[in-house]
Amino acid sequence: MKALVTGVAGFIGSTLAERLVADGVDVVGVDSFTDYYPRPMKERNLAGLLACRGFRFVESRIQDVDLAALLADRTHVFHLAAQAGVRKSWGRDFAIYTENNIEATQILLEAVTKMPSLERLVYASSSSVYGDNTPMPFREDAMTQPVSPYGVSKLAAEQLCFLYFANFKVPTVSLRYFTVYGPRQRPDMGFHKFLRATILGEPIAVYGDGEQTRDFTFVQDIVSANIAASIRGVPGRVYNIGGGSRVSVNEVLDLIGRIAKRRPVVRVDSVQKGDMRHTYADTSLARADLAFAPTVGLEEGLTAEYQWLNESIS
């Protein structure tokens, strides 16, 4: 396998690239260091990879890089580059989401139509493509009705992947990630904010009553799903990738208190536009096709993120 990983300096991209390199895969990584969160964090994510012989890094946007040269001998593409964040996707900033999530994906898909060596393109989609009225657990064939502009952009890119499969036989596989957490998690994400505030003794903002639930998925399980999809994923298909259980924010706060041995201080804020009330993945299709099953439970994974963040702060 010779892989291209887009968004390689990010939370999931860097973790995936490290696993691939450890498995002996030749990896080219591309990232543009968007300013959504501080560049030094992404540089730390890359530090270990840059010392590896099986890894080469290119700093560029997908729209600007010479894709023909970048893809020349690649057999697999993992497309994780995206503009993240539900709450920032409203208003004028939506142009950034269309540019980085939709336009960049279409440009990449167009480029790989000229790649006879391509075995799989694995696209990082999101549970945000579902809506609040979706029956739980969410199945891949449920109606998609995003409640945020971010979700709309991810669904549009997912649809582009299917169109390029249907019309050009590009072997795309899309993975709908459910709330990914673990070491290197972005600073705007819930667990990172909760853990950091608890470590520093600061209040945690909880939006609403805290009874909203999520299907939390550890980053190494997401990495395993990507690798399985690159080998066994059925081209044209979409798979849910979840952690296997619904947990409320209040339950998470209790667990953080036990892990940190310090009771979190909570400040209740109003519910934010675009936040889904509940998410829960039906992963039976991924289990059947990819042999996917989550291996890291919430307490184990949250402890790993706590230890990483505690070391980063100190």
Please report, for each region that a protein language model flagged, where it lies by residue.
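Active-site loop immediately N-terminal to the catalytic Tyr-X3-Lys motif
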Residues: 93, 175, 187-188, 235
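Active-site proximal helix/loop that lines the substrate pocket
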Residues: 82-88, 126-129, 179-185, 211, ...
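Short-chain dehydrogenase/reductase
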Residues: 89, 178-179, 238-241
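A glycine/serine/threonine-rich, flexible loop-to-helix segment
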Residues: 136, 187-195
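N-terminal Rossmann-like NAD(P)+-binding domain of SDR-like oxidoreductases, especially those catalyzing
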Residues: 1-176, 220, 296
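C-terminal substrate-binding subdomain of Rossmann-fold SDR/epimerase-dehydratase oxidoreductases
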Residues: 16, 198-314
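Aromatic/hydrophobic pocket-lining residues that form π-stacking "cages" and hydrophobic walls in ligand
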Residues: 108, 157, 161, 194, ...
